[in-house]
Amino acid sequence: MFNWIKTFMLMAAITALFIVIGGMIGGRSGMMLALLFALGMNFFSYWFSDKMVLRMYNAQEVNETSAPQFYRMVQELAGRAGLPMPRVYLIDEAQPNAFATGRNPEHAAVAATTGILNILSERELRGVMAHELAHVQHRDILISTISATMAGAISALANFAVFFGGRDSEGRPANPIAGIAVAILAPLAAAMIQMAISRAREFEADRGGATISGDPQALASALDKIHRYAAGIPFAAAEAHPATAQMMIMNPLHGGGLANLFSTHPATEERIARLMQMAQTGQYPA
């Protein structure tokens, strides 16, 4: 129930951003059009955003024949978690990373890059996929997929406001500086909405993944290795669609400044420390 409340609040907050930007572009008429657009986007995001994200990353579905060891690993972990078998995808990218998507456990998918399969041991990879299945178990995947889709749409709409100008509430041409401000601040506002739900969600998925796999130390080792390797390997699809970065087990984006300030992922060192404490004491710290 709490996840449905979070989903509703996320949709409401991002819809409000759409309306504000619509008002900047076209006054009252723009606000109404933006509201209709936001409602349409919410509907689309619920039903189709998982397919869109998988297409963005050119993810290829695999099965027990094409990737037997990886597929059976996910199958075994899904059984341990009491989940239906998700669809399994591989992404031909060198950067080690993984994510889960879908609107519910019955329509879930997990995806991993070829890079993560190449650098992790079987035990570490098992920890990563258990983490992704924990997102499915906690029903986080709908929230993360919707927020990624809607945040991308907000950025596009804000850029539209800059290039095509706008109208105030009386229908007069809007201040162009205000349009530029919207283009800068609207994506940041969308990122902050994502941050409000993403960081705590990653800690919970670490705890849940360690419980599913029964091996918190393996996930800690995997996070350390992914963090070190990912920093030196660009991920073109993620850079092209930065709003989807919060879906990944590790931030795939490069660069400093705002990219780090508004990171939707908690510090890797803290994630590892919590998992190591769980390995030693059997309890994940609050």
From Swiss-Prot:
What one GO molecular function would you report for this record? metalloendopeptidase activity
Report the family membership: Belongs to the peptidase M48B family.
Q: What is this protein called?
A: Protease HtpX homolog
Membrane topology reported for the UniProt record: Multi-pass membrane protein
Cell inner membrane: present as a keyword of the record? yes
| Cofactor(s) recorded in Swiss-Prot or TrEMBL | Zn(2+)
Q: Which UniProt keywords are given for this protein, alphabetically ordered?
A: Cell inner membrane, Cell membrane, Hydrolase, Membrane, Metal-binding, Metalloprotease, Protease, Transmembrane, Transmembrane helix, Zinc
Entry cofactor note text?
Answer: Binds 1 zinc ion per subunit.
Starting at the broadest rank, the lineage of the source organism is: Bacteria, Pseudomonadati, Pseudomonadota, Betaproteobacteria, Burkholderiales
Query: From which source organism is this entry?
Result: Ralstonia pickettii (strain 12J)
Per UniProt, subcellular location reads as: Cell inner membrane
What Gene Ontology biological process does one annotation of this record name?
Answer: proteolysis
State the active site.
132
One cellular component term (GO) for this entry is:
plasma membrane
* Gene name for this UniProt entry: htpX
Return the CDD domains for the record.
M48B_HtpX_like (cd07336)
